[in-house]
Amino acid sequence: MTSGNNINQPVTYPIFTVRWIAVHTLAVPTVFFLGAIASMQFIQR
């Protein structure tokens, strides 16, 4: 039970910022364009 700290920080992948950047460089523009395209459907006269 002394290795309870290992659960909070996995030693196998200590660098999670590269994974965070890789996910958000794809997720943020995707959500932005989906929101922009969805909003265009309603502003047509």
UniProtKB/Swiss-Prot annotation:
UniProt membrane topology term: Single-pass membrane protein
This protein's UniProt keywords: Electron transport, Heme, Iron, Membrane, Metal-binding, Photosynthesis, Photosystem II, Thylakoid, Transmembrane, Transmembrane helix, Transport
Pfam families: Cytochrom_B559 (PF00283)
Named cofactor requirement(s): heme b
UniProt-listed GO biological process terms: photosynthetic electron transport chain
TM region(s), chain numbering: 20-36
Molecular function terms, GO-annotated: electron transfer activity; heme binding; iron ion binding
Binding site for heme: 24
InterPro entries per the UniProt record, alphabetical: PSII_cyt_b559_bsu, PSII_cyt_b559_CS, PSII_cyt_b559_N
Tree of life domain: Bacteria
Primary localization class, coarse: membrane
Subunit: Heterodimer of an alpha subunit and a beta subunit. PSII is composed of 1 copy each of membrane proteins PsbA, PsbB, PsbC, PsbD, PsbE, PsbF, PsbH, PsbI, PsbJ, PsbK, PsbL, PsbM, PsbT, PsbX, PsbY, PsbZ, Psb30/Ycf12, peripheral proteins PsbO, CyanoQ (PsbQ), PsbU, PsbV and a large number of cofactors. It forms dimeric complexes.
Function: This b-type cytochrome is tightly associated with the reaction center of photosystem II (PSII). PSII is a light-driven water:plastoquinone oxidoreductase that uses light energy to abstract electrons from H(2)O, generating O(2) and a proton gradient subsequently used for ATP formation. It consists of a core antenna complex that captures photons, and an electron transfer chain that converts photonic excitation into a charge separation.
Name of the protein in question: Cytochrome b559 subunit beta
Upper lineage: Bacteria, Bacillati, Cyanobacteriota, Cyanophyceae, Nostocales
